[in-house]
Amino acid sequence: MKIVIASSHGYKIRETKTFLKRLGDFDIFSLSDFPDYKLPQEQEDSITANALTKGIHAANHLGCWVIADDTMLRVPALNGLPGPLSANFAGVGAYDKDHRKKLLDLMSSLESLVDRSAYFECCVVLVSPNQEIFKTYGICEGYISHQEKGSSGFGYDPIFVKYDYKQTFAELSEDVKNQVSHRAKALQKLAPHLQSLFEKHLLTRD
């Protein structure tokens, strides 16, 4: 069964591929395999809308099942920022380090700040060319560190520490992060749908 990961981001592709391979013998592709196809710009005000926009668009144009996702980081002390703006927090086209710097600067300006709690929320969608849609969510709670640590991962990973851990996401190995992250939790909830689809595919093929 062919399935496309609607991303060109190496880390996301590896994480999702590893997950899919545990469920069945899927024919797995990513947007890197379709250089002429471009996802629409993320312009919605929710991760659900962004994930659906990407998933539906890719499924329609590529003619196969697609997995798409969108993630945001929320910091309660900053009234939920960066929120849906997470990917463009420091401006469209800014680097990950710019987004992290803006967040740390905002937090340092709150002199009486005690609560550094934060959480990632991820929406993952599985979409068919016929507009069949499965949707799941995953949340990972933790806090924002005072400075960047680690060189792995991407985005806000160098400043996010999961509760019960002493290392930032950027200091964890990919294997560990892929077991506890927000995306991992959302993908795990998608597993029954994927397994059912794979079994139906085998029956149809036989």
From Swiss-Prot:
Substrate binds at residues 7-12, 71, 154-157, 177, 182-183. One of its GO terms (molecular function) is ribonucleoside triphosphate phosphatase activity. CDD domains: HAM1. Binds 1 Mg(2+) ion per subunit. It comes from the Bacteria. Its EC number is 3.6.1.66. The active site is at residue 70. InterPro entries: dITP/XTP_pyrophosphatase, ITPase-like_fam, RdgB/HAM1. NCBIfam families: RdgB/HAM1 family non-canonical purine NTP pyrophosphatase. Homodimer. This is dITP/XTP pyrophosphatase. It comes from Chlamydia pneumoniae. The lineage of its organism: Bacteria, Pseudomonadati, Chlamydiota, Chlamydiia, Chlamydiales.
